[in-house]
């Protein structure tokens, strides 16, 4: 087969410029170090391609295989891996330093829904003016908030003052 690589990640057939290459047969056996022209003939006889697997090695390692099938398998694996990846969103719940108990209850119910859905939750208590002097109140609010939802979430990053906000990140509990 006379396939010229459209895939820039691999060097195939006549694109291999080295004089000698280490060849692995289509069955996985080592054929040793042979001239590139001879390796190309071997691949052509079997109606397969010579693909440089490690072009930077000395001598380069090449494998006799069906390149089209190989590329198809690679893209199939990539799609499968991409499909199995779970994208974790971070939802934010904002509280104020002077929040009332009922409002904390409503916000914690929203955070509970996010955690059950599998999202992480960033809980931020915003301080205005001189309220940062009373950061302990913010920590109390966050502790109270966490007590309401500790059955569905765990603290990933404990409460910490960042500028005028005290932030805590919660993650869903593992089942």
UniProtKB/Swiss-Prot annotation:
Pfam families linked to this entry: IF3_C, IF3_N
Single GO biological process annotation from the record: ribosome disassembly
Localisation: Cytoplasm
PROSITE patterns the UniProt entry points to: IF3
Top-level taxon of origin: Bacteria
Gene3D superfamilies: Translation initiation factor 3 (IF-3), C-terminal domain, Translation initiation factor 3 (IF-3), N-terminal domain
One of the record's GO molecular function terms: translation initiation factor activity
Keywords on record: Cytoplasm, Initiation factor, Protein biosynthesis
One of the record's GO cellular component terms: membrane
Entries under PANTHER family matching the protein: TRANSLATION INITIATION FACTOR IF-3 (PTHR10938), TRANSLATION INITIATION FACTOR IF-3, MITOCHONDRIAL (PTHR10938:SF0)
Function: IF-3 binds to the 30S ribosomal subunit and shifts the equilibrium between 70S ribosomes and their 50S and 30S subunits in favor of the free subunits, thus enhancing the availability of 30S subunits on which protein synthesis initiation begins.
Entry's family note: Belongs to the IF-3 family.
NCBIfam families, per the entry: infC (TIGR00168)
Subunit structure: Monomer.
Name of the protein described by the UniProt record: Translation initiation factor IF-3
Organism of origin: Clostridium acetobutylicum (strain ATCC 824 / DSM 792 / JCM 1419 / IAM 19013 / LMG 5710 / NBRC 13948 / NRRL B-527 / VKM B-1787 / 2291 / W)
UniProt lineage: Bacteria, Bacillati, Bacillota, Clostridia, Eubacteriales
The gene coding this protein: infC
